[in-house]
Amino acid sequence: ELLNWLQTRFGYTGTQDGALAFYLGLPAEQQRVFARSVYFNELQAGGREYNDPTSRRVGSYLRGRQAIASLFPDKDAQGRPIQRDGTITMFGPSGIRTDFGGGIQTLTPGGKLIVGVEGQVPPVTSGLLTQGSGDIQIYSKDSVLLGLSRIMTTFGGGILVWSAEGDINAGRGSKTSLLYTPPLRVYDNAGNVTLSPQVPSSGAGIATLNPIPEVPRGDVDLIAPLGTVDPGEAGIRVSGDINVAALRVVNAANIQAQGESRGIPTVALVNVSALSSASA
């Protein structure tokens, strides 16, 4: 994995044996980019193994917890406890957005992530949004809460949320559709074609959208080993597959996925016709 990353990002042409030495010679900022990539990949794999009956670690969060312990150990090199604090709170129109590609990663190892608070409805640009291709990856020690805001990939890309000790709640945002200009093919002077990322971003909650066939579907992974996953009133919409691993899942009927669903309890449907016949 390191070799491929170095070749893609830096054009590394050396051997696999020399890859580590090359990596250690990079600036600390670049080393952290790769470390975060590996970290979130491990969290995602650990969450999926939990619901994979063919995995040796089915029903276990061991892989993810080992990754967390590696990046955020409880003690320093001298054996002294490490105290971490801090919560990310996004008020009103605040948020993080990328245009024309680029992912979003947030780490709150000492607190919670609050994306939008209750009260005045925020604008559609608030929350965590990728408006080109790009993933959203979130780790929080405590809960990940959406008030009236959103976490969305609107033009391809997946969403990963791991709450180590808290809940994941998609909030109470409105589902009212807000229509925008559909994506258009844009041609430059050389005849190259790009797609405009200004796509419909309707409603709130958690969603991966693929508004046109050219856009790949995005998967969603929600992991809360000690908490509850709740789509709330805003709901969770997934253009690809969804994997949920949590102590409890509620309001499962408000989770919509076009692909495969894992870890979501089956919603019992009431046979209205049978009830009507019985009461006749």
What are these regions (language model features)?
Residues 1-280:
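Low-complexity, glycine- and small/polar-enriched segments
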